[in-house]
Structures are given as structure tokens and as C-alpha cells.
Amino acid sequence: MRKTKIVCTLGPSTDQPGILRQLLENGMNVARFNFSHGDYAEHKGRLDQLRTLSKELDVSIPAMLDTKGPEIRLGEFENGKEQLTAGQKFILTSRNVKGTKEISSITYKDLPHDVSVGGRIMLDDGLISLRIESITDTDIVCTVENDGVIKTKKGVNVPGVHLSMPYMSQRDRDDILFGIEQGYDLISASFTRSAQDIMDIRHLLDEHNANIRIIAKIENQEGIDNIDEILSVADGIMVARGDMGVEIDYAEIPSIQKHLIDHAMQMGKICITATQMLDSMIVNPRPTRAEITDVANAIYDGTGAVMLSGETAAGKYPVEALKAMAMIAETTESDTNYESLCHHVGMDSTRLTISAAVSHAACTTASDISASAIITASKSGETARLLSRFRPDAPIIACVLDETTCRQMNVYRGVTPLLMDYAHSTDELISMSVKAAEDAGLIHSGDRVVVTAGVPVGVSGTTNMIKVHLVGDTLLTGIGINPGLNAKGEVCVCRNAEEAAKKFKAGQMLVVPFTTNDTLPYMRQAAGIIAEEAGANSHSAIVGLTLGKPVIIGATHATRTLKDGMKISMDCARGVVQAMSE
């Protein structure tokens, strides 16, 4: 089960018949809606289609609204685009003019008051560099430093300059209100500079009683400098490397990426690494070797999610890009040292709570017993977030009560959310959550799982209990020999050595009334041994210890209860034999 989540941006390419369905079927975890492009009708149409297909395919996919943010763009060009030549003069103006080879209007009218002579302005994600020569109240006269084609509405970046423009524009406010009305689950806040930027959005959400999680997009030096205060109020961050690579020295991006991912991981917050991850797949069916390594390194660093932008929104190969991303993630995860990751995150005494301590203990317990999963029943999803922080190898199954929380949990690394009904007691909570996970095919009879919950039931933030639970119906009990060993397999009931000689096959679970030296060859080949005879000095016990085999002795009526061909599991530590689902 892949732990790293994949965010796919919807756009014209995903509007093609059948494409969105294929993305959902091939592992898309989050759908991103880029509000820098398109209108409300387009976004609503895509959201409606997402909700319809998600329900049909029974998947919980959150919708993420990516705001336009306090960005600066060029105005309209008479011919749509112009060729600029190194050495020529080019004017950026706050006046409303049609763009030509010599001049373009800009969307931020106070930019002439924020910049200085000698500074640099970058156009179109840094493809064209301008050096500021002189400034008037309305015009910024620049020298073009390199050849390039400039187009209508392309972005403008001013590296190292604090802009006095307000964070949330009326456009962003309207977009967020639209998102509240339509039921979006996440907001990615573009160009976040400070904690106050996030609080401005949160106040707007609170005014409308909206349960939407906020992810701060870190794209400039201010955001990097203020990362701790931003993380303290945001639900997570996006390492948005596109504008970041224009706003700061691009050679610093790898170290900044590691720094941001680590901060988010230490604080248990969502972390999405984004921009140009498989950029070549916009036009090519396979990624470059450098892109493969880029995705893998972000996962090695601990990112919780990776994002596809133009690859799925406007590319020729949206489904292939998703499949490639998923394959890279799965391969990288198989080579990840989870104990080292958990140790790296550790327990921070400044953020130590009972819930955090229990979550950490659940992760270490799951590692110690090689649990098939960690199951948490949570009203708010907070426990799932805490578990995800410690990056366990075992998948985290979060059983929640409402659809919005269920969708929101799908952005957290390693978390698979499930809907369940309200439980009235702790025992009911455990049984219902285990059954929900079993019904979903995430765990199976015979699996050992770690369950966390809160007592009393139904109170948020009270996770204070851990239980190791064996999934399935108990068929037999006895005394386990070699308690550190377990086995699963197909039953072969043999009442004596002659019967074993006729039908026993290597790797089966040997079920006998007792053993003798004549059955020794079959004991050697068995996956596990279940004997009715009891006693620590019995033949079965002594041979089991000598061979280092999982053995349960004293299993009364085993040869009558178990039938040939049954699939069972045995847990020597507990002396339990359970039925496995087919």
C-alpha cells in the first residue's frame, strides 16, 4: 500500500472523456483546482464530476482550492506575445495600456513604489530577467538581460523585495467563498509570507463556519524565514518550487526543500512537494532520470505528498504521469528505513501530549510486532495526523465519522481513511473499526493490528489507549512454543505418520494429535505445527524448540475442529489459532 500521497491538478486534459476516472482508478489521492486559471463554471463542472466518480468508485478524494494569491501578472499584449531582445529597454507600467515590444501594464499598481533602481524583475517564471534603470510614479524602466518571448498574463516576480500589497485580494476572498459554498476540503494559500496571512483566511472560514484545512504555499524568502510561525497556524505546507526558484537563488532550492520538509514533519503537519516533478511528461510518455531522482529524494526527505501540475492539467500523458509517480513512490518506500525516520522525528518535549505519546507508542509497538496496520478511531482525525508524523512502516487506517474529515485525511502520509458509525463504548469502537478495515480489504483474518482509541468515547483529543488485536475468529487456543514466531497457511490434518506420508505437502500447517520420531520429517517441512498433546516436555514441544518452528500444543480437539484445506493463522505468543479470510 503506497504511503506517499499524490496530488493531481485538474484541467483541460482531465476534461477528456474517461481521464478523471482513470486517475481515480490509478491512485490519485487529492484533486487540485488551480484558481489562477478557469472560471467558476469550469471548476464547478470538474468538482461535480469528481464527486460523482468518487461516489461511484467508493473513494474519498479531497478537493483542494489553490488560490491566485498576491501575485503580479503582465497585462494583455496586442499580438498575444512579443519577442524581447537582450539590451533593449522595456517598461512595466501601472497605466492601462496594450502590451507591445516596448511596454506592458502590470496588475499591481503600486509596484513602482516598492522597487529600487538596480533591482531585478523576473518575467514568466524567471525565463526573462529585467534590470531596473529608472522609476517614475507609474513606470519602471528596465533593460532586458536575455532574449525571450513574453506573453499575455505571464507572471512577474521581484526577488528579495517586500511588497506592500495586501495578502488577500477581493478575488481571493470571492474564490474562497465559492469554495465554501461548493464544499471544498482544502485550501492551498499561494505566496504565504507570514502567519497573519493564514489567519486572514482562517477568520474568513470561521465567519462562515467552514471546515476547510489550510495549506500554506511557501514560494518566497519571507515564507521561508517565517516557516515556524506559519506552521504553527497552518495545517500544512506546500513546497512550491516554481516561484521559489525565481524569488531566490535556484541553487539553494534543494537545501531549502529539505529544511521545509523536515520542519513540517517535526510538527506533524501536511507537506506537499510540488512543481516540475515530472515536467517532461507534459509532452513525453516517460520521465527523465533526473525527474525520477527528484521525486524519490523528496520521499526520502520525508515529504507526505508529491504533486503533478501541468502534467495532469494540460499534458498529453496525464494517466501515464500518475502511474509513473506512483511507481517511483512505491519503489522508494520499499527502500525507506522507517525506524530511522521515526527516531529522527522523535518526541519533542515542547509538544508532548498524552495523545502524541500514545501515538508514538503505537508506532513503535507496530514496528516491534510487525503489525499489519495501525487502526485509529478518531472524531477529528487528529490521532491519524499524530500517527502520520512518526512515519510508521505499517499503514494507518483512520476510521472517522463524517465525509469531510474522511476526505481530508487522505492527504496525510500513510493514512487510509474509512467512514464508520458512532460507537457507544470502547469495545464497540474497537470492533467496529476493525470490522470496517476488514470489510474494506485492508486487513485480513489472522493479521495482528495495533488499535488506538480514546476513553471516554466521543471526546476529541483524548487518545489514551493502545491494544494489540488479532483479526478474525478464534478457532483454538493452546500454549505457544517459540512465542516470537507465527505462521499462516493451509491445514493438513494427519492422525499419524502414515497419513502424513500420503497427503502432507511442504509449507502446510501440520495438525496432529501428537508427534513421534516418525513424523519428524513432516515437522521439518511444516509452516507450523498444532498438536493436541500438552506438556512442556512433550515430543511436539521439544522438537518445535529444537527446529525453531512455530508450535502450539494443548490445542484440544484440533484434529476435529480443523479441516484439510482450511486457511488458518497461528500466534504462538498468545497460543491462538484463527481462521483466515479466503
Describe each PLM feature range.
Residues 70-169, 436, 442-498, 525-526, ...:
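Acidic, glycine-rich flexible loop/linker segments
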Residues 5-7, 30-32, 60-64, 89, ...:
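Structural preference for beta-strand elements that scaffold enzyme active sites
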Residues 44-51, 312-335, 467-469:
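C-terminal helical cap(s) of enzyme catalytic domains, especially alpha/beta-barrels
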Residues 352-360, 364-366, 468-522:
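Protease-associated
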Residues 3, 8-13, 42, 161, ...:
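Conserved alpha/beta-domain cores
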Residues 10-12, 29-40, 186-191, 237-248, ...:
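Glycine-rich phosphate-binding active-site loops on the catalytic face of alpha/beta enzymes
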Residues 9, 34, 66, 118, ...:
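Conserved, mostly hydrophobic/aromatic
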Residues 38-42, 46, 394-395, 399-429, ...:
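Feature captures the catalytic cores and cofactor-binding loops of soluble hydro-lyases/lyases
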